[in-house]
Each structure stands twice: as structure tokens, then as C-alpha cells.
Amino acid sequence: MSKKRIYEYAKDLKIKSKEIIHELKKMDVEVTSHMQTLEDDQIKALDKIYKPEKAEQSEKSQQKNTQNKQQTTHNKGNQSNKGNQNNKPNNKKNNKNNKNNKNNKNNKQPKQEEPKEMPSKITYQDGITVGELAEKLNVDSSGIIKKLFLLGIMANINQSLDDETLELIVDDYGVEIEKEIVVDEEDLAIYFDDETEDENAIERPAVVTIMGHVDHGKTTLLDSIRHTKVTAGEAGGITQHIGAYQIENDGKKITFLDTPGHAAFTTMRARGAQVTDITILVVAADDGVMPQTIEAINHAKEAEVPTIVAVNKIDKPTSNPDRVMQELTEYGLIPEDWGGDTIFVPLSALSGDGIEDLLEMIVLTSEVQELKANPEKNAVGTVIEAELDKSRGPSASLLVQNGTLNVGDSLVVGNTYGRIRAMVNDLGQRIKTAGPSTPVEITGINDVPQAGDRFVVFKDEKQARRIGEARHEANVMQQRQESKSVSLDNLFEQMKQGEMKDLNVIIKGDVQGSVEALAASLMKIDVEGVNVRIIHTAVGAINESDVTLANASNGIIIGFNVRPDTGAKRAADNEGVDMRLHRVIYNVIEEIESAMKGMLDPEFEEQVIGQAEVRQTFKVSKVGTIAGSYVIDGKITRNAGVRVIRDGIVQFEGELDTLKRFKDDAKEVAQGYECGITIEKYNDLKEGDIIEAFEMVEIKR
């Protein structure tokens, strides 16, 4: 058997040399390259893998040839030796021809197979190539390339096809086509379905959030509802605070989110969680519409949920419910009695008057919304609160929005995962299952999630762990990247990338007239690609609630003649919210227009880096005055700007010419060291002068 190189053997089989090399390495054969020659025993071993039929025939043929050789040797003596010498190359040639014949036979076998039938329907993903389409249709790719050519498209086998071209080609073959939807299992949002069309869906309790101005009676109203409707099962025990609770009214359950008002409401919405079905806007009848009332209205409008107005404190002598209704009409909340669609309920949270009417209106509104969920599915929902308990470890208060949650379920919560060890309801009772719209507290997760994070239950614990770990890693990577919050500095870049359609703006000013004038001016800005959208205006300092709303809406805050309070400044830094403070309306307009056009100039501030005292001066011809100096603070650097200060008055401001330490040039000289300094275009240096070095640093906005 003649020796062959690896690539020749692979070529005969019409396969890649890498496959042959891989098989040889499995046989513990050291392979250097595809040019390496194969030994006879190696070829035999490979034949058994790639050509088992040929290997058997080769063995039989070899045995037969051996017998013939022995017989010829006995019969013909010396002549046979001569004959064998003559026949030997012929045998090799014949063997080679036989091998080629067998290879040719093997090569022809696929052609002899019956052609596969063309499917009646195929599916595809974005970016499908000509070759992949040919494989799906069971046709030769050259036919598809020809059809594309007739359509005026020059393509090769690796050319990607768009949807329109794909439909034309497939329609020509008479085959139906359907696009595959690639599902990212790590995206928890895909597990949240609309249950209104599900045949197994049943009615679920409404989830209600109470908002309003401080001291208008939100907490009192919650307490009044709770004490009126919570069953005696709570008596004698301590209520478990899990951020929400359920009551029952005429056989209908209602879930109330017991959260700190606007902040939690918008924080959840900022993370994509649509938890609330109905908002209750509490307005004091003796106080009317206040700044936080307007904020609450804007929050509810942004969340696109129905609002019921609870006019509280009607038992006070100074109460005036009609005035409240009149004021709220200015914000689009028009009472039903006045031809609008907003429900107004007069009540007294302190005495309990009107509580029954409010609950009845909540039930009525929820019936109109047709809130449904399927309890047969795996549970999905949202985190209301979360904390790290020293004795129990990480715990989370969850609101089940669909399906049924069970003790022992494996789940992914935000960017963590776990298995439910224990579950407690709002009455502090241990339970094993929780249906839709039920608030519970669980333990058993690996880390503390954030309020507003979603949770999803998986049947397979390994799947939950895999998805949880992947989300955690992705979150770590995201935190390392720069904040994606919109600011005037990155506005143009986001516009170019198509990420920005509306620029959401919150305006706070010193007087109402200024706020209205600024809002009107901003609305007139017309730059192609993005619209200015005013989502909230108010008079007064910028507070933490403004920052929370800006973060939830991916907007910016403009302060006109006002400053942010301490909490707002800290929150803006933490959340990456852009705040712009101005005193001239024209400057606001110009800045936003420039940002939209990508021409916003960077802002710099001066940063003093060091000071040196002149101890002695030397005048040198062709050089000027050299100041023998001692660095008394910070450092002096070669590229810094400098100013000469004499008796507290700036004499000159310019740049360093040279900075030397002894006779050598220095990049910088630190505090406590002497140096020689010359200043460009300035020689009037005197002993006792202070040379101050400074740098201009770009302000991060």
C-alpha cells in the first residue's frame, strides 16, 4: 500500500484535513501538519472509520493475494520471482485504481440517492444566508443565486437575505415562510403575559397605591381601611410589615401597597415594573391641591393607571370639597358629576365616614378593568421591599401578579436566585401557597434584590441557577460601564443612535410666571429628531421627588433661580440624573438647542495644584529671570498654568517656560523641594513672590 499525505487522504474522502488530524490524535499519533505522510497501519485504521466496507474488502483482497503469491511461488520457482517483480508495480497500480474506483463509487452514492422533497413550510431567523436557505428548501444554492440575479441582486452563497427578498424567493418555490422569534430566556419580561385572553384566567384582586400631599391623611386612610376590614385573625398578634396587605370587601379582595408614596411608586416603574392597577389620590378638603398633589397626579399619568380622588377631612369646619374639585379640573381630573370620568369620594379617614364608598368604587373600577390572572401557571411578580435580616439572611416581599407561588419553588429574583424556604403573608402567618395579587415575604434567596425587580419561578432548579448567575454577571458588567442616563452632554449621541425620541424635562422655578414662560419657550424648540416634553412643573427648590421622577422618566431637571436641596443633590449623583441651574431663560434655550445639535461646549473649572515661594532671583542673558523657588504646597508641574502673586494681588498669569531641579529639566517638583522656574514672557519676579500652579479640569455634568 503506497504512502499518502494527510491532505491527500482527506481529499479522496472529500473531507477536511482537520477531521483526519483529529482522528489521528485520538489514536495517539503525533501530527505536525496536514503534509505529514500516513503509515500503512494508520491508513488501515482510518479506513475502518471512514470506509469500513473498503477496509473489509481490502483485508479479504490482501488474504487472497497472499494465497496467490504462495501458490505462484511453489509452481513457478525463479520465473515467478521475475514475474512478481514485474507484477508488483502492476498490483500497486491496480490497488490504487481499485481504491479510486471505490472512492468514485462512494462519491456517486449521494447522487444516486433520491432527491429530498421540498417542504411546504420553513422557518427562518434574521440574517439567513443563501446557503442556509438552500439547505432548508432542499435545493441547490446555485438556483437561488440565479433567481436573485434575475431580481437584480448579485449574491453569493454567504450573502444574507432581508425579509422582503426572502419572501420573493420562497414564494417562487411555492413554500410558506415563518419568522422565528428568538427568545432571550434571561429577560424576565418575556414571562409576563397578558392574561385577558387566557381561557384559564380568572378574576384577580386589584392592586391599589395611595398617594397625596404630606399631612393630607394617606397613612390615616390606610390605617382606617385596615382596622375596618382586617379579620380577627390578626388579633393578639403583631402584624407582619411586608410592604402590602389585603382586605376583603363584600367577598372581593383588594391589595393595598403600603409603600412610602411617590418614591417607591416611581422607583418600581423606573425598573419596568407595572405593579399598580389603581391609584388613590388623597386631597385634604381644607387644604386643596398642594405641590406633592401635583407630583402624584403626574406620577399616575406617567404610569397610565386610573385615579380615584379621595377628598379627605370633610368633617372639618373649614373643608370645601367643591374647591378641591375645581382645582383638580386644571390638571385633567374632572368629576363625573361635572361631565368628566374621574371618581371623587368625599370621606373622613379619622371617623371612617365614606370608607365603604371608597372601597366600593375601587371594586367597581377593577371590574371595569377586567383584571385577570391564571393561577395554574408558574408564579411571576414584583419585589415590593427587600432587606438583609441578620438571623434569616436575605428576604424579599413579593407581589404575585400571575400564577401560584409555592414553598420550595426555584425562582430568579432580579439579579439573584434561590429556593423558597419559608413564606409569610401580611398577617404574619406561615403559608404554603400564594395566588395572584397576594403579597408575601419569602426567605431562601442568595442576595438582596431591589424594590421593583421582577421575579419568575422555574420548574428546573438548574435553569433558575443558570439564569440567575447570568443576570448577576450581566449586571456587574453593566455597572462597570458608563451610566446611560440622558444628559445634555450625551443627548446628541443618543439622538444619533436613535435612542431618544422625546427629551423629558422637569422645570422648577422661583415663581409661577417664570416656570410658565420657560415651559412655553422650551416647547417652541424645533430640532429634527427629538421633541421637548414637559412632564412636571412646580415652584420651589428641587427636591428628591423631582430626581426620582426624572430618573423614572429618563429626563433632566432644569432649575430656574432655585437650587437643589441636600437630599436631591445626593440622589441626583447616585442616580446619574442631569440637573441644570440657570438664571436667564435665554441661556436655558440656547443650552438645550446646542445639546440637540451636538454643539454643547465642555465646561472647565480651575484647580490649584501647588504653590512655590521665590527665595532668590537670577538674571541670565538670553534666558531672562530665573526664580530659585521652594515648593510650599502641593506640586509644580511642567505643563501647568501659573500666576504670580505679590502681597495677595495677582501680578501676572501665563505659562511656565522651564522647570528645573538643579541643572536637570523636571516634569514636576513636589512639596518640600527646591527648583528653578522661568515664566514665559515675564521677568519681573521678586523675592517673596508666590508662584501658584493650576490646571483647567473639565467638569463632569
From Swiss-Prot:
Pfam families per record: EF-G_D2, GTP_EFTU, IF-2, IF2_N
Annotated segments matching region G4: 312-315
Entry keyword annotation includes Phosphoprotein: no
Biased composition (Basic and acidic residues): 48-62, 110-119
Region (G1): 212-219
UniProt xrefs under InterPro entries: EF-G-like_DII, IF2_II, IF2_N, P-loop_NTPase, Small_GTP-bd, T_Tr_GTP-bd_dom, TF_IF2_bacterial-like, TIF_IF2
Region of interest called G2, as start-end residue ranges on this chain: 237-241
Organism from which the protein derives: Staphylococcus saprophyticus subsp. saprophyticus (strain ATCC 15305 / DSM 20229 / NCIMB 8711 / NCTC 7292 / S-41)
Annotated region (G3), positions in chain: 258-261
Keyword tags: Cytoplasm, GTP-binding, Initiation factor, Nucleotide-binding, Protein biosynthesis
GO CC terms of this entry: cytosol
Protein name: Translation initiation factor IF-2
Family statement: Belongs to the TRAFAC class translation factor GTPase superfamily. Classic translation factor GTPase family. IF-2 subfamily.
Record localization: Cytoplasm
Residues annotated to bind GTP: 212-219, 258-262, 312-315
Record-annotated tr-type G domain positions: 203-372
Predominant localisation class: cytoplasm
Molecular function terms, GO-annotated: GTP binding; GTPase activity; translation initiation factor activity
Compositionally biased residues, Low complexity: 63-89, 97-109
